[in-house]
Amino acid sequence: MSVLGRRGAGLAARGPTLAPLATASYLIRSFSALNRPPPKYPGHVPLTFLERGALAVGSAVGSLMNPRRADLIAALGEATATPYFIYRLRDAMLSDATGRRILRDRPRITSETLKLPYLRTLPENSVGRTYATWLDREGVSPDTRDSVKYIDDEECAYAMQRYRECHDFYHAVTGLPIFVEGELALKAFEFLNTLIPMTGLSIFAFVRLKPAERERFFSLHLPWAVRSGLASKELINVYWEEILEKDVDELRKELGIERPPDLREIRKLMRQQQKREKERLEGKS
């Protein structure tokens, strides 16, 4: 008799009620734990089809409720990128000479590898200075990106990691801030540039915008995202570490990126207008 057969027989001997439940529980544990394939790289967490689906649904709902949960957004990105989309991203790198070098070199973007104090000394309109200035203004760090763990193919996992770590460069080059309205504009742009499903799904967070913000998103920044996302080159193939001293305006032109309307300036002008209107109404009373 097999081990499973002996286990089932033993449980059956304990009673007719407990035996089916205990045997089913054992089978589930055996399927989900013992039959799961081994990790393929350090930190890899293999998932079954059902587990991946549950992760996608759970992280989608959670990130919609709280768009600031970077861990849920990262999990959603990995769960929905498989099987097709992450291979498309990896193949886009393989089809480009610079992309192939990035896959071969496997550079990582951190505050140490980029030497942020040095970037702050570069010319004002350089890519590196623009990036460092954006980080300082938004109060964020390149060291906070989660490591990829739910993508099975090791090379594809690096492609996703590279996209994740380059995200702040996309912010810096476009000038978009990190509050929800800015993130949605950038995610729409990224979706048309990378086709990563998570970036497209993130757009549904527009329901959390105020009416004025929602109108601005659909009238200004979504059209910008469509134009630039469709016209721009594959950003995954940009070797950012090698162009830090390049003029950022020249880079935008080479990549085909149109700079979007300045969200911070727009919000500032609207606050000033609201303040003047409030003072005018108070003066009448």
Swiss-Prot record:
Primary location class: mitochondrion
Record flagged with keyword Zinc: yes
Localization, UniProt: Mitochondrion inner membrane
BP term (GO), one: ubiquinone biosynthetic process
EC number per UniProt: 4.1.1.130
Record keywords, A-Z: Lyase, Membrane, Metal-binding, Mitochondrion, Mitochondrion inner membrane, Transit peptide, Ubiquinone biosynthesis, Zinc
Residues binding Zn(2+), per UniProt: 167-168, 171, 183
Catalysed reaction, written as an equation: a 4-hydroxy-3-methoxy-5-(all-trans-polyprenyl)benzoate + H(+) = a 2-methoxy-6-(all-trans-polyprenyl)phenol + CO2
A single cellular component GO annotation: extrinsic component of mitochondrial inner membrane
Pathway(s): Cofactor biosynthesis; ubiquinone biosynthesis
Co-factor(s): Zn(2+)
Keyword Oxidoreductase: no
Segment annotated as transit peptide: 1-31
Signal sequence bounds: none
Membrane topology value: Peripheral membrane protein
InterPro entries for this protein: Coq4 (IPR007715), Coq4_euk (IPR027540)
Record-stated family: Belongs to the COQ4 family.
Complexes and interactors: Component of a multi-subunit COQ enzyme complex, composed of at least coq3, coq4, coq5, coq6, coq7 and coq9.
Role, per record: Lyase that catalyzes the C1-decarboxylation of 4-hydroxy-3-methoxy-5-(all-trans-polyprenyl)benzoic acid into 2-methoxy-6-(all-trans-polyprenyl)phenol during ubiquinone biosynthesis.
This protein's name: Ubiquinone biosynthesis protein coq4, mitochondrial
Gene name in the database record: coq4
